[in-house]
Design a protein with these regions (language model features):
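Conserved thiamine diphosphate
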Residues: 9, 13-179, 183-186, 203-211
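A generic structural signal for short, well-ordered alpha-helical segments in conserved domains
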Residues: 189-192
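Acidic-enriched catalytic cores of C-N bond-cleaving enzymes acting on peptides and small amides
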Residues: 198
Length: 212
């Protein structure tokens, strides 16, 4: 999916490449470098199985970095939680390690909708207002779960990579820090409830949106 900006006009174009990761990445790079090759600002957004991204087309991701491409790569169905029935090839648990090797790739592993919105807004500002030659890699899940309201004042922490999302303070004696990102964060919240209710141990929950 890509959005092209020409002056004050905006157009939206959808492309479905099929089982053609190399071709899809090539299309994304072409759109992501159109600002310098054709003097046309575009916002390419490429969605794929997260396992079929850096693991299969890591050389193209490097090429995107070398060519100063701008845009968003969305590693969908990440976290090893929902596609086990389709085989191990769909279970991604390490794409962020690969993404971290590219200096101008900014990676995030959000859990909730407001985190994703804050990251997208900042990415658009950095790439298309500040003209930074970077691109974003963001992993998302396809689990069905409730999303909480955005805590006040958390935007800066989301962008920096970590913020406190919940505080389980009841017994005021033992307190531990629980850190989670992406698919595992909701399990951290469940673990905090068990620790407090069954073991009288308080905790703080931190959403780690990025280790990048």
């Amino acid at each position: 999916i890509s959005k092209g900006l020409v002056g004050s006009e905006m157009c939206i174009r959808d492309r479905e490449e099929g089982i053609n990761e190399a071709g899809a990445m090539s299309s994304w790079i072409a759109a992501g470098t159109s600002y310098t090759n054709h003097d046309i600002e575009m916002i390419p957004i490429y969605l794929f199985y997260s396992m079929f991204g850096f693991q299969r087309t890591g050389d193209f991701a490097w090429a995107a970095g070398d060519s100063q491409a701008r845009g968003f790569l969305i590693g969908a169905t990440a976290g090893r939680t929902t596609l086990a029935g389709e085989g191990l090839q769909h279970q991604d648990g390490h794409s962020h390690l690969l993404a971290s090797t590219i200096p101008n790739c900014i990676s995030y592993d959000p859990t909730f909708h407001y985190e994703l919105a804050v990251i997208f807004r900042e990415g658009l500002k950095r790439m298309h207002e500040n003209n930074e030659n970077i691109f974003y890699y963001i992993t998302t899940m396809n689990e069905n779960y409730s999303h909480p309201e955005m805590p006040k004042g958390c935007e800066d922490g989301i962008l920096k990579g970590m913020y406190r999302i919940k505080d389980f303070s009841k017994y005021k004696k033992n307190k531990i820090q629980l850190l989670g990102s992406g698919a595992i964060l909701r399990e951290m919240i469940s673990a905090a409830e068990i620790l407090q209710n069954d073991y009288e141990i308080d905790s703080e929950i931190w959403s780690v949106t990025s280790f990048n």
